[in-house]
Amino acid sequence: VSIFDKQIAKYLEKGILEEKGRSVGMRPIPLAIYLIEEWLLYRTPEKLKEFIEVIQKAPQRNVLTNSFCRRFELMGYNYKARDLVNQLLGDNSPFADAEVIDSELGSRLFCSFVNVNPVAVSRLYTKVFGNMPKEDLLKIETGRRNIVWTLEKLCFAEETFESGASLMLQFANSENETWSNNATGEFTRLFTIYLPATSVNLERRSFFLKDKIRK
């Protein structure tokens, strides 16, 4: 038995780790957050990209991706995490590709990234989807659920409302989903008088609509 296996068994017995199917996870959330903060200290954009690529090649890639995203999306307050996402999604980003974003794994990563640095996600989404023809937007299917959820978060934040709402409108005009929380439904919810799906005030939302109508 390796030293690693012995340590895993030791912390499982103490209840610090817990088994989840074929994987093992950290049980106390504060400790898990502390560990990812420590891990981030030594990450560069290149190393984060390599890490994501390794996950995507693993047999358990869906489980590993979801586990990573659940932890990483809690790092919105961490300057290192924000800077990493900003650089990772900057110029010549490997993620600036519609096929990558529309994949199950790629779209899930963006659901995590948007909680850490919505401005960086907004910038890249606008670059990829901003001028995409309707017929191409209609072909976005595999990752569409995650893309719409990511756009919801962009629409909610004041600093990314206009870009997020513009993209949501584009997807709504190229709708291919039938459930109520599709892009069309979520765009409509931005403009209700009471309990809108955004933190932006009514005046600013009205100005956005008038501007779109004029165009």
Which residue stretches match the model-derived regions?
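Hydrophobic residues within the alpha-helices of tandem HEAT/HEAT-like
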Residues: F187-L195
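HEAT/HEAT-like alpha-solenoid repeats
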Residues: T44-P45, V200-S206
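C-terminal leucine-rich, beta-strand-based interaction scaffolds used for sensing/assembly
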Residues: V1-E159, L169, N181
